[in-house]
Amino acid sequence: MKNTILILFTAFIALLGFFGMSAEALADPKADPLAGPNPDADPEAINLKAITALAKKLLG
């Protein structure tokens, strides 16, 4: 059961990362893709560190 939850959580985080980066790419299409994320490009970009911290807090 714990493995299933871990797999689903990992897939959820991967999807959030994919859609977050897609939104950032749409917001700043001229950005260098190898330069890394630009926090100024999309103010509503998903904060993965906050999501990870919340998940650790909830799952223990």
From Swiss-Prot:
- State which residues form the propeptide: 28-45
Positions carrying Leucine amide: L59
Q: Name one GO cellular component term.
A: extracellular region
The record's subcellular location field reads: Secreted
Any one of the GO BP annotations = innate immune response
Q: In which tissues is it expressed?
A: Expressed by the venom gland.
Leader sequence range is: 1-27
Which keywords accompany this UniProt record? Amidation, Antibiotic, Antimicrobial, Fungicide, Immunity, Innate immunity, Repeat, Secreted, Signal
Does this UniProt record's set of keywords contain Nucleotidyltransferase? no
Q: Which domain of life is it from?
A: Eukaryota
User: Which regions are annotated as AXPX repeats?
Assistant: 27-30, 31-34, 35-38, 41-44
Keyword Signal (UniProt): yes
The principal location of this protein is secreted
For this chain, the family text in UniProt reads: Belongs to the MCD family. Mastoparan subfamily.
The protein's job, in short, is:
The synthetic peptide shows antimicrobial activities against Gram-negative bacteria (but not against all strains tested), Gram-positive bacteria (all strains tested) and the fungi C.albicans and C.parapsilosis. Exhibits moderate hemolytic activity (25% at 100 ug/ml) against washed human erythrocytes.
Q: What is this protein called?
A: Mastoparan-VT3
